[in-house]
Swiss-Prot record:
Family matches, as SMART domains: MACPF
Alphabetized UniProt keyword annotations: Cell cycle, Cytoplasm, Glycoprotein, Growth arrest, Neurogenesis, Signal
GO BP annotations, alphabetical order: cellular response to retinoic acid; central nervous system neuron differentiation; negative regulation of mitotic cell cycle; positive regulation of neuron differentiation
Major localization listed first in the record, in broad terms: cytoplasm
Domain (MACPF): residue spans on this chain: 68-251
Known function: Plays a role in neurogenesis and brain development. May suppress cell cycle progression in postmitotic neurons by inhibiting G1/S transition.
Organism this protein belongs to: Gallus gallus (Chicken)
Subcellular location: Cytoplasm
Family as reported in the entry's similarity comment: Belongs to the BRINP family.
Domain of life assignment: Eukaryota
Organismal lineage: Eukaryota, Metazoa, Chordata, Craniata, Vertebrata
InterPro entries cross-referenced by the UniProt entry: BRINP (IPR033237), MACPF (IPR020864)
Residue ranges that the Swiss-Prot or TrEMBL entry lists as coiled coil: none
Residues linked to a glycan: 156, 433, 443, 553, 599, 631, 677
Descriptive protein name: BMP/retinoic acid-inducible neural-specific protein 1
């Protein structure tokens, strides 16, 4: 055995076994690389790239076995050292190199190029030489596992992996029993692959001839291989060039020279290899890895949908009525099992996101010097809103083997594949502000019963209408004078007597058919005094007309401000007519034939007609006066003989309000209001007098509907409260109680939203 040991020590560095071979790999093996923690082996650059264990790992990883578990033991026989390399005096004691290796060195010459070094030395003998190692034998059990299959088979991959570890740890105690059990698991699940390895002399086994047993190099944490660069056996003038050539071969794949400048190292590519700085293979592998990670991300969502927790959640959702996003969200938050499963999904996706980000950063870092621009988009996590929409789609767009996406705004499905067969019958909506109480058992899309205050009609709930004849007993909203707008305009032009409302003209500043100076504000009122004289009527205004006469060559242009009191009261309880705003009409000015008089007409029509008790008209003038006359007052007696002042005078010969009166039964309405007020004060149930409540709600709505226009976003004026105050003589507290009772009935019983109003009286 001694002569074999001596021969090994002197020839170790020139044998194929001791020189680490360059990484030549066939194309079929290139696609079998793995990344992540094995990046140092990527791109054919690892010293053990052709080792049997690494190739086996690559093959198993390609098949989906991502986890490797190995248990082994070694039997060291010899510690060997390369004593020839330890010599320091290489000139006087030259190394016993093989003639072929010496001939290769001589062929290099004094100034070899990088390509000569690669072709002559590196491709044949490698880049490193073995200094010391351990020879002996090794036996090992290697097990490759696919955790995804273990998860599907057992339901808990962590416990399964731990059980396999415990089983494999008994390999050296009961080899036959352990292997038999592992092979059974391998055949039944297909989730593991088991390999036994036994090389070299093992233990104290009896061998007929120990020299006939080939020892192997042991490679473990206890038995390390010590390597050194091959340049130590070259002459000094070749050592630096060899190191540069080796780096160019390893880092640039022999397609350029590896150069470091200003702490920045890179490949200077040859003309025939302009992309030598671009690791195409690495980039393709990482892009493939990112694509697989994106698939894993999508599969994580499918795993949640296929989980028992999610299926149980879907079964518990009510199916007898329509589920909105808000109601599904409430059920989602109340399911604790689903919440725990969803948290596991979020944690796994967070870990997956970090892996994707790390790989993407490496990908973009590798492609800095490439013409190839990687195109990668990080997967986006599905939000809670998207999960709730997904639940809706599973409920209502999963029929006849087709799938689709549900649109709640349209209450319909968008089926995938261009068909319309995926939509199931959409249940009716109940609860909340909806009128339906229960869906129909015969057809779930239609309503089966309605809430109080509604009636069922053809599968829909409609508000219970108040009897029009009974409503007319309180206020006669419908009269014979409800003409169309064109008819009203024609009648106003003809000054039809049917539209006259006989009002009382009151003014301390103006006399009809008398000239006056309008340069200061003038006030006049047209009132009915219905609280005293016409108690059984309320009045509607549909137009106003004034006849204004001016002096010849007058430059005055009157301007009116009109305030309306709907049911009497003080001036502060009136509202101003917004001429030309929010669609409100303007004054129309028509000159009378052969006269200096004009008819000023305001036509409200059916759209802007409203209640009135008193109309206040404020008159000012827009006039173009000389600067000397602007400071003169318009007060004092009218002097028609003065030509300089006469041109400013005007007179109003006629003022008329057009409209009609509605019969008003104050006593009957007061009794209905007092009934509601008493019920509210005693805390009674509102639905006990639902007919009265519906009647008053209808009257309030029809009265407030005639309120004047307001700016967008602002509430309408409350005319109903003004009527209660001035025509029924209710106190403020009684008015508040009545309105509150009506609001409660509207929201609690009828499930309708209240319309905000602004206080006027």
């Amino acid at each position: 055995m001694n002569w074999r040991l001596v021969e090994f020590l002197y020839l170790l560095f020139i044998w194929d076994h001791i020189l680490v071979q360059p990484s030549h790999q066939d194309p079929a093996a290139t696609n079998q690389h793995v990344s992540k923690e094995f990046d140092w082996l990527i791109s054919d650059r690892g010293p053990f790239h052709h080792s049997r264990s690494y190739l086996s790992f690559v093959e198993r990883h390609r098949q989906g076995f991502t986890t490797r578990y190995k248990i082994y033991r070694e039997f060291a026989r010899w510690k060997v050292r390369n004593t020839a390399i330890e010599r320091r005096d290489l000139l006087h004691n030259p190394l016993p190199l093989m003639p072929e290796f010496q001939r290769s060195i001589r062929l290099l010459g004094r100034r070899p190029t990088t390509q000569q070094f690669i072709d002559t030395i590196i491709k044949k003998y490698g880049t490193h030489i073995l200094i010391s190692a351990t020879l002996g034998g090794e036996e090992a059990l290697t097990m490759y596992m696919d955790k995804s299959r273990l998860d599907r088979k057992s339901g808990n991959a962590t416990q399964s992996v731990e059980a396999l570890h415990q089983l494999a740890s008994s390999y050296f105690v009961d080899r036959d029993g352990t292997m038999r059990r592992l092979h059974e698991i391998q055949i039944s699940t297909g989730a593991i692959k088991v390999t036994e390895t036994r090389t070299g002399p093992l233990g104290c086994n009896s061998y007929d001839n120990l020299d006939s047993v080939s020892s192997v190099l042991l490679q473990s944490t206890e038995s390390k291989l010590h390597l050194q660069g091959l340049q130590i056996i070259f002459p000094q003038y070749l050592q630096e060039k060899f190191v540069q050539s080796a780096l160019s071969y390893i880092m640039c794949n022999g397609e350029g020279e590896y150069i470091c400048r200003n702490s920045q190292c890179g490949c200077q590519c040859a003309e025939e290899f302009p992309q030598c700085n671009c690791p195409i293979t690495d980039i393709q592998i990482m892009e493939y890895t990112l694509a697989n990670m994106a698939k894993t991300w999508t599969e994580a969502y499918k795993d949640l949908e296929n989980s028992d927790e999610f299926k149980s959640f879907m079964k518990r959702l009510p199916s007898n009525h329509f589920l909105t996003i808000a109601s599904i969200h409430q059920h989602w938050g109340n399911d604790w099992d689903l919440q725990n499963r969803y948290k596991l999904l979020q944690s796994s996706l967070e870990a997956q996101r970090q892996k994707i980000q790390r790989t993407a950063r490496k990908l973009f870092g590798l492609s800095v010097r490439c013409r190839h621009n990687p195109n990668h988009q990080l997967p986006r996590e599905r939000t809670i809103q998207e999960w709730l929409t997904r639940v809706q789609s599973l409920l209502y767009c999963n029929e006849n083997g087709f799938w689709g996406t549900f649109l709640e705004s349209q209450r319909s499905c968008v089926c995938h594949g261009g068909t319309s067969l995926c939509q199931r019958p959409i249940p009716c909506i109940i609860g909340g502000n909806n009128s339906c109480a229960m869906c129909s058992l015969a057809n779930i899309s239609l309503c089966g019963s309605c809430n109080k205050g509604y009636k069922l009609y053809r599968g829909r709930c409609e508000p219970q209408n108040v009897d029009s004849e009974r409503s007319e007993q309180f206020i006669s909203f419908e009269t014979d004078l409800d003409f169309q707008d064109l008819e009203l305009k024609y009648l106003l032009q003809k000054m039809d007597s049917r539209l006259y409302v006989h009002t009382t003209f009151i003014s301390n500043e103006i006399r009809l058919d008398t000239f006056f100076d309008p340069r200061w504000r003038k006030r006049m009122s047209l009132t009915l005094k219905s609280n005293k004289n016409r108690m059984d009527f309320i009045h509607m205004v549909i137009g106003i007309s004034m006849r204004i006469c001016q002096m010849r060559n007058s430059s005055l242009d009157p301007m009116f401000f009109v305030y309306v009191n709907p049911f009497s009261g003080s001036h502060s309880e009136g509202w101003n007519m917004p001429f030309g705003e929010y669609g409100y009409p303007r004054w129309e000015k028509i000159r009378l034939q052969n006269s200096q008089c004009y008819n000023w007409t305001l036509l409200l029509g059916n759209r802007w007609k409203t209640f009135f008790e008193t109309v206040h008209i404020y008159l000012r003038s827009r006039t173009r006066l000389p600067s000397l006359l602007r400071n003169e007052t318009g007060q004092g007696p009218v002097d028609l003989s003065d030509p300089s002042k006469r041109q400013f005078y005007i007179k109003i010969s006629d003022v008329q309000v057009y409209g009609y009166s509605l019969r008003f039964n104050a006593d009957l309405l007061r009794s209905a209001v007092q009934q509601v007020n008493q019920s509210y004060t005693q805390g009674g149930q509102f639905y006990s007098s639902s007919s009265v409540m519906l009647l008053l709600l209808d009257i309030r709505d029809r009265i407030n509907r005639l309120a004047p226009p307001v700016a967008p976003g602002k509430p309408q004026l409350d005319l109903f409260s003004c009527m209660l105050k001035h025509r029924l003589k209710l106190t403020n507290s009684e008015i508040i109680r009545v309105n509150h009772a009506l609001d409660l009935y509207n929201t609690e019983i009828l499930k309708q939203s209240d319309q905000m109003t602004a206080k006027l009286c």
